[in-house]
């Protein structure tokens, strides 16, 4: 993947401003509410009965933060995201048996949460860079499935 200077700067800027303790939990909670079938991967998380329970669930919050910190690895290795996520792809494919389509659903939820947090500064150009980055991450996480 070729990255422009603008794309690199944009991705670094977004992640430097993210409030991980807010955005991570909000992203995973949104995914679990909007796409309830994704809840099957989190059976050990306890009460996921409704949107309020999901939003207040400490395990959802913790894992949402973990996911964002996982994206830090891609930010730091933008020129080699596929290899950066090779082990994580194997884990999600062979041990956790996660449907790879769910990575895109989570990426879409992250885009919505980030757009809401950034407001007018999340322009079309910024969104294009962010979604390009997330599409490379999603592809890398799904690599083991191919």
UniProtKB/Swiss-Prot annotation:
InterPro entries: Globin, Globin-like_sf, Globin/Proto, Hemoglobin_b, Hemoglobin_oxygen_transport. Belongs to the globin family. Residues 2-146 form the Globin domain. Keywords: Heme, Iron, Metal-binding, Oxygen transport, Transport. This fish has two hemoglobins: Hb1 (major) and Hb2 (about 15-20% of the total). They display the Root effect and the alkaline Bohr effect, which is enhanced by organophosphate and to a lesser extent by chloride. This is Hemoglobin subunit beta-2. Heme b binds at residues 63, 92. GO terms for cellular component: blood microparticle; haptoglobin-hemoglobin complex; hemoglobin complex. GO terms for biological process: hydrogen peroxide catabolic process. PANTHER family: HEMOGLOBIN FAMILY MEMBER, HEMOGLOBIN SUBUNIT EPSILON. Red blood cells. Involved in oxygen transport from gills to the various peripheral tissues.
